Amino acid sequence: MARKRIAFIFTQGPHGSSAGREGLDALLATSALSEDIGVFFISDGVLQLLPQQQPEKILARNYIATFGVLPLYDVENCYLCERSLQQRGLSKMADWILDVTVLSPADLRRELGTYDVVLTF
């Protein structure tokens, strides 16, 4: 049986919704079963990787640092949408909490098209 390539897309900001935390939990669980995982951050999802967040000030759980351990789970294909960064006034050279490749929307779509399963959070 051929191995499925699985993509996780984060589209929402880290606070105000549980989507990011749930997506990260699903990603970690899937990493135990699959080695071919890609992680994509688009739209407000790029905010998931900003350093120095203080969610405890809004009484939210700080799960963001957990993204930084993805390489320990052999999850190394991580991508940020360049246009999403520009729209939010963020630099593609920022000190993200995870090593990522910044891609243009066209390149991001092309890369995403190589995955068999796409899960969006």
Swiss-Prot record:
* Localization: Cytoplasm
Instruction: Return the Pfam families for the record.
Output: DsrE
Which terms are listed as keywords in the entry? Cytoplasm, tRNA processing
Q: What is this protein called?
A: Protein TusC
Query: Where does this protein come from, organism-wise?
Result: Yersinia pestis
Q: Which GO terms describe its biological process?
A: tRNA processing
Give the matching PANTHER family. PROTEIN TUSC
* UniProt keyword tRNA processing present: yes
Q: What is the protein's major site of localization? A: cytoplasm
Taxonomic lineage from the root: Bacteria, Pseudomonadati, Pseudomonadota, Gammaproteobacteria, Enterobacterales
Q: Does the keyword Lipid metabolism apply?
A: no
Record GO cellular component, one term: cytoplasm
**Which family does this protein fall into?**
Belongs to the DsrF/TusC family.
Q: How does it assemble?
A: Heterohexamer, formed by a dimer of trimers. The hexameric TusBCD complex contains 2 copies each of TusB, TusC and TusD. The TusBCD complex interacts with TusE.
